[in-house]
């Protein structure tokens, strides 16, 4: 007889009508339960540790343990000592990429200053390294990091007009009470 778990009684009768009975109890292992848990990914492109464990069934188990993975959906099959199998599926998420941007006001006069505005987005707010910065002409790099310490950078070049150079010349006055012609010119600036 093919039977599942349970208690069964069997009555046996021979050709002469003599009979006897027997009872048997068949047990089975408890159902195997497979579970998974994962650590959080703090920065885009980072790794999570997935822990897969099993209870029930018959030890030892094959397929349990810790697994290092990137974001995505994963299915982990586990087999017990009797060859019975079950699986668990887990989805790992990650923050978006931290991005930084910068812009600058114009320097109107040679030797002046500009205001560079640095902002962040993506990742996990709030951000460090953002704000407004007063700078002279040059190239600047700013590092922006989010609440999880994930960082990126932005660079900006601030230009300025050339220096205004003024030159002048005058013709000589030849006679007392005479006049001179003065010429004034400027180069540079805007």
Language-model features and meaning:
Residues 1-190:
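Proline- and Ser/Thr-rich low-complexity, intrinsically disordered segments
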